Curated annotation (Swiss-Prot):
Domain of life: Bacteria
The name this protein goes by in its record: UPF0213 protein lwe0147
Residue ranges of domain GIY-YIG in the record: 5-83
Organism: Listeria welshimeri serovar 6b (strain ATCC 35897 / DSM 20650 / CCUG 15529 / CIP 8149 / NCTC 11857 / SLCC 5334 / V8)
A Pfam family reported for this protein in Swiss-Prot or TrEMBL: GIY-YIG
Annotated family: Belongs to the UPF0213 family.
Length: 90
């Protein structure tokens, strides 16, 4: 169950190896919705999907800015972004 006032930017890896970035207040619920084909045209035909990265933010605005910035990146830069974040978490 999500706690009040939690805001996340998340990245899914789709079955076709593409990435999808999004905003949610509950990462687990949102992953289940994507896999059920609920509320997302892009991932509906690319299931199953798996959350491979998420970041927590203090505000919705910060999380949606991170989402927008990620979506503007090229595939190569998205790969680099995810590798850097993975290394930071180790």
């Amino acid at each position: 169950m999500a706690k009040a006032n939690e805001h996340f930017f998340y990245v899914l890896k789709c079955n076709d190896n593409s990435y999808y970035g999004g905003y949610t207040t509950d990462v687990t619920r949102r992953e289940a919705e994507h896999n059920a084909g609920i509320r997302c045209k892009y991932t509906k035909t690319r299931r199953p999907v798996k959350v491979i990265h998420f970041e927590k933010f203090e505000t919705r605005s910060e999380a949606t800015k991170a989402e927008a910035a990620f979506k503007k990146l090229s595939r190569k830069n998205k790969d680099s972004y995810l590798i850097e974040r993975e290394e930071d978490s180790e």
